[in-house]
Regions:
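Charge-rich amphipathic alpha-helical interaction elements
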Residues: 1-140
């Protein structure tokens, strides 16, 4: 019995690699977005702490106001960054799904080719068994 060889095996292996790269890219984008969201939560915690601490005199109030203003600016920048990262993550997810589908098509082709090969092998084996049984009857 000969071994199964898929004609498009190299293409299939490359599609597997592409799918893996797309998945890694998506996960990288997802992690970057999650880290930015964590920074936003930390920034919010910092703001709450500053507001709860309060200020005793006029100079301390001015410093507090400047710190809060800086936190607001950082928050706006982070929100813009998060929005951009969300769009990149969605684009990377769509690309990953597309690469996964491309690989799936070749996987189905490989499975069908394997089934056809097995069918041919079984027919050859059955023909050999039939021939053997005919030879056995002739000698008996």
């Amino acid at each position: 019995m000969s071994s199964f060889a898929f004609r498009l095996q190299k293409v299939f292996e490359y599609r597997e690699l592409e799918e893996g790269w797309a998945k890694d890219n998506f996960l990288t984008k997802h992690i970057a977005r999650m880290e930015a969201e964590n920074e936003l939560f930390d920034l919010d915690d910092n703001r709450k702490f500053l507001l709860s601490a309060g200020a005793d005199d006029l100079q301390a109030r001015r410093e507090l106001e400047l710190r809060i203003q800086k936190l607001d600016d950082n928050e706006r920048a982070l929100r813009l960054l998060i929005h951009q990262l969300e769009m990149e993550e969605e684009q990377a997810r769509d690309e990953w799904i597309l690469k996964k589908q491309d690989k799936g098509v070749l996987e189905k082709l490989r499975d069908k080719a394997y089934d056809a090969w097995m069918y041919r092998q079984n027919k050859l084996e059955q023909a050999a068994l039939d021939e053997w049984s005919i030879q056995q009857r002739k000698t008996a």
